[in-house]
C-alpha cells in the first residue's frame, strides 16, 4: 500500500483512461499509475482516509467522461473519482435513484456509443444517463458478469447462466442458444465482421456468427491446443489474432489458422492466474493483464517462443510388470531399451510395457505420445500425455512397434518417430 506501487496484488480490472494513464481495481481499493510522472495514487483502500463501513474490494472501472472514473465492487454504490478536480471522491447510488433493493455487488460498468453508462451486478442491470443521472432498470436477468455493446440498438449481457441479447428500447432479453448448458460467461469480444468470441469458465472458447445467428465452433482443451477451458480475457491484436488470459497463462489464437500458441509458467511466464475481464490495451503498443500476482505488461506484437524439442527416450522396460535389465538371467535385452532396435521375446514374454519421455524440453505439457504395433493394430493410439505403452498377449509373429512424439499446439506436427522390431517366438 505504498505510493510507489499497486495498492494490492489481486487485480480484478485494469483500464487505460483518455490521458493514457492506467487504473487498477483491486481487492483493497483502486490504484492509478500516471504514465508521464510514473507516480502511483490509491483510492478507497484500507490505507486511505475513508469511512470504515465502505467497501474496499473493486471489480470494475469505467471512464464515464474525460477524467471521471467510476469504480464498482462489493457494494451497490458506485465510487466516483474526478481526476481534474484534485481527485475529488464521491459516491453515487443508482439503486436508490431507481427505487430498488441494493445490489450485492457491481461486476461490470460499461459506456455505450450513446454515452449511457451500463452497470451490471448480482440482482440488476441498470442504464444510467450520465447527464441527468436518471436510471432505467432492465429486470429479467441476474448474476451479470460482463457487458458489451452489440450495436446502437442492442447490448450483449453475459451472466453466470449464459449469454443474452438485450434490446435497449423494449427491454426484451433474448437468450443466445449456445451448445453447452448454462455457460458461465467471462469475456466477450465482437469483431467488426460480426463474429463474437465468447470466453467461458469451464467450456473453453465459443465462436458465434451474429449475422447467421449460429454457433460456429467450440474450442476446448480436448479438441485443440488450448491450455485451459477457462477463458478470462480476450484482447485483439493488430494482425487479427487474439491474446487470451487463462488461469494457466496466456494463449494466442489465430482465427485464420485455427491454432493456439501458449505461454505458461513452464516456459517462464511470471504471473500465471489471470482474472476474468482484467485486461486492457495500453499506450497503443502494449497489453496489460491483471491477475492474482499484480499486473503483467506485454508488447502487443509479442511472439511466443517456438517450443524447443529434443529427442524421444525409451526406458523402464518390463515383462509381466517386472523390471527387466540387460544381462539379467533370461533377459531379452542385450543393451538398454533406449538403444534397442530389435527385441526377440519368447511366447511367455508376450505381455510387456515401456515408458517414453522427452528430455531437455522446456514445455513438457505440449508433448503428446501416440503408438501402434504394425501387424497387430490398425490405428495409432489417440495422442495423449500418457507416456506408458502397455502390450498384452501379443501373438507369435514379426511386428514393428512405432512411437511418435506429437506437438499439442500443432496437431499435425510430429517431432520424432521411433521404431523397434519385435519378434514373438511360438511356444
Locations of regions flagged by a protein language model:
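Residue-level "micro-hotspots" composed of small/polar
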Residues: 1-12, 48-58, 98-102, 140-143, ...
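Beta-propeller domains
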Residues: 123, 145, 161-164, 183-189, ...
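Conserved beta-propeller blade signature
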Residues: 21-24, 68-71, 116-119, 154-157, ...
Amino acid at each position: 500500500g505504498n505510493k510507489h506501487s499497486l495498492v494490492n496484488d489481486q487485480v480484478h480490472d485494469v483500464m487505460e483512461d483518455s490521458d493514457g494513464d492506467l487504473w487498477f481495481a483491486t481487492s483493497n481499493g483502486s490504484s492509478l499509475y500516471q504514465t508521464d510522472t510514473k507516480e502511483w495514487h490509491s483510492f478507497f483502500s484500507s490505507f486511505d482516509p475513508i469511512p470504515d463501513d465502505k467497501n474496499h474490494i473493486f471489480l470494475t472501472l469505467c471512464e464515464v467522461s474525460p477524467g471521471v472514473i467510476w469504480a464498482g465492487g462489493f457494494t451497490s454504490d458506485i465510487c466516483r473519482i474526478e481526476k481534474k478536480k484534485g481527485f475529488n471522491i464521491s459516491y453515487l447510488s443508482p439503486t436508490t435513484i431507481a427505487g430498488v433493493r441494493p445490489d450485492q455487488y457491481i461486476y461490470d460498468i460499461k459506456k455505450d456509443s450513446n454515452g449511457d453508462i451500463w452497470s451490471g451486478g448480482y440482482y440488476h442491470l441498470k442504464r444510467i444517463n450520465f447527464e441527468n443521472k436518471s436510471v432505467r432498470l432492465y429486470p429479467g436477468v441476474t448474476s451479470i458478469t460482463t457487458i458489451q455493446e452489440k450495436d446502437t440498438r442492442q447490448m450483449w449481457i453475459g451472466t453466470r447462466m449464459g449469454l443474452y441479447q438485450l434490446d435497449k428500447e423494449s427491454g426484451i432479453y433474448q437468450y443466445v442458444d449456445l451448445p453447452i448448458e448454462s455457460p458461465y460467461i467471462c469475456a466477450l469480444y465482437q469483431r467488426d465482421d460480426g463474429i463474437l468470441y465468447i470466453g467461458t469458465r469451464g467450456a473453453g472458447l465459443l465462436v458465434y456468427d451474429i449475422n447467421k445467428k449460429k454457433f460456429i465452433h467450440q474450442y476446448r482443451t480436448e479438441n485443440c491446443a488450448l491450455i485451459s477451458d477457462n477463458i478470462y480475457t480476450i484482447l485483439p491484436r493488430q494482425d487479427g489474432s487474439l491474446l487470451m488470459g487463462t488461469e494457466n497463462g496466456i494463449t494466442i489464437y489465430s482465427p485464420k489458422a485455427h491454432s493456439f500458441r501458449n505461454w505458461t509458467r513452464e516456459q517462464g511466464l511470471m504471473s500465471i492466474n489471470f482474472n476474468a475481464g482484467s485486461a486492457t490495451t495500453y499506450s497503443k503498443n502494449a497489453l496489460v493483464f491483471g491477475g492474482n500476482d499484480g499486473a503483467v505488461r506485454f508488447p502487443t506484437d509479442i511472439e511466443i517462443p517456438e517450443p524447443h524439442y529434443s529427442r524421444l527416450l525409451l526406458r523402464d522396460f518390463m515383462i509381466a510388470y517386472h523390471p527387466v535389465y540387460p544381462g539379467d538371467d533370461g533377459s531379452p535385452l542385450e543393451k538398454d531399451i533406449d538403444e534397442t532396435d530389435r527385441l526377440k521375446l519368447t511366447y511367455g514374454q508376450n505381455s510387456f510395457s515401456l515408458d517414453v519421455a522427452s528430455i531437455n524440453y522446456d514445455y513438457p505439457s505440449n508433448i503428446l505420445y501416440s503408438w501402434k504395433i504394425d501387424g497387430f493394430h490398425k490405428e495409432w493410439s489417440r495422442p495423449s500425455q500418457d507416456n506408458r505403452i502397455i502390450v498384452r498377449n501379443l501373438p507369435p509373429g514379426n511386428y514393428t512397434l512405432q512411437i511418435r512424439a506429437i506437438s499439442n499446439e500443432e496437431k499435425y506436427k510430429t517431432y520424432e518417430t521411433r521404431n523397434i522390431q519385435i519378434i514373438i517366438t511360438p511356444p
